[in-house]
């Protein structure tokens, strides 16, 4: 893929392949604003409104609807048509109450699945890394750009710090309260967020750790008993015994 960073405009021909846009009909595509998701892992809000959900026929119509505040992402109204919407984000159409989640799907990389109002109250966010901040408290840095502070009563014995990198938090939106924690262990139910196995779901059989994260290999078993391997980078925990999010029919 051609370089897309550092420029204000994006040619349609070099836009991410999973964007459902008419590349031969239009020279330019909407370039996402800098935000919680990189360009190769998100949709601009305009593309969701116009090309995926079909609420507008043209970019002008989509921009108007978005600027009027008809769409929420993770519980907050977003009026920027370039806003990047990515993995596990929840989209709500304010006027109709319809809600959708962005999930990994085979071949297309990312897609939307309609969810009910209860499920739309939370999202899953993977812990990418942890840092210790002033006072000895722990800050969890999540895949969607969020930071969650874990307050520690005794920095010398931080019993509150039960969270490990690459585990997943179930958090309320928009309040960002931790509802659940799913560690990445053997037996954890995961979905694959990238690579040739993108969108596949299964339980972790084993984790062979390499020197770096991208060289660590995870063996996973799907519901049919088929085993496959993928990079640790692509493994996203979604539950312990059952998924905490709705999946496409037949995925698990």
Curated annotation (Swiss-Prot):
SUPFAM superfamilies attached to this UniProt entry: Alpha-L RNA-binding motif
Annotated ranges, domain S4 RNA-binding: 43-105
Any one GO CC term of the record: cytosolic small ribosomal subunit
GO molecular function: rRNA binding; structural constituent of ribosome
Keyword entries, A-Z: Ribonucleoprotein, Ribosomal protein, RNA-binding, rRNA-binding
UniProt cross-references to SMART domains, sorted A to Z: S4 (SM00363)
GO BP: translation
Record carries keyword Disulfide bond: no
Keyword rRNA-binding: yes
Superkingdom: Archaea
PROSITE patterns named among the record's database cross-references: S4
Family, similarity comment: Belongs to the eukaryotic ribosomal protein eS4 family.
Protein name: Small ribosomal subunit protein eS4
């Amino acid at each position: 893929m051609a370089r897309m960073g550092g420029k204000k405009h994006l040619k349609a021909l070099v836009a991410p392949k999973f964007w459902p846009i008419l590349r031969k009909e239009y020279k330019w595509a909407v370039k996402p604003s800098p935000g919680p998701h990189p360009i190769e892992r998100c949709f601009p809000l305009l593309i969701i409104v116009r090309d995926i959900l079909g609420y507008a026929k043209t970019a002008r119509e989509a921009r108007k609807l978005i600027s009027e505040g008809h769409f929420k992402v993770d519980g907050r109204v977003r009026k920027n048509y370039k806003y990047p919407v990515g993995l596990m984000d929840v989209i709500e159409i304010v006027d109709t109450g319809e809600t959708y989640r962005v999930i990994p799907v085979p071949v297309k990389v990312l897609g939307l699945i309609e969810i009910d109002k209860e499920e739309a109250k939370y999202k899953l966010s993977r812990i990418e890394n942890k840092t210790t901040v002033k006072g000895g408290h722990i800050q969890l840095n999540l895949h969607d750009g969020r930071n969650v502070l874990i307050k520690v009563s005794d920095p010398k014995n931080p019993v509150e710090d039960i969270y490990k990198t690459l585990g997943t938090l179930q958090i309320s939106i928009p309040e960002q309260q931790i509802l659940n924690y799913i560690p990445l262990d053997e037996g954890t139910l995961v979905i694959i967020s990238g690579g040739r196995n993108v969108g596949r779901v299964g339980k972790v059989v084993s984790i062979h750790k390499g020197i770096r994260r991208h060289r660590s290999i995870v063996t996973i078993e799907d519901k049919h008993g088929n085993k496959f391997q993928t990079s640790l980078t692509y493994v996203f925990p979604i539950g312990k015994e059952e998924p905490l999010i709705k999946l496409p029919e037949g995925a698990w």
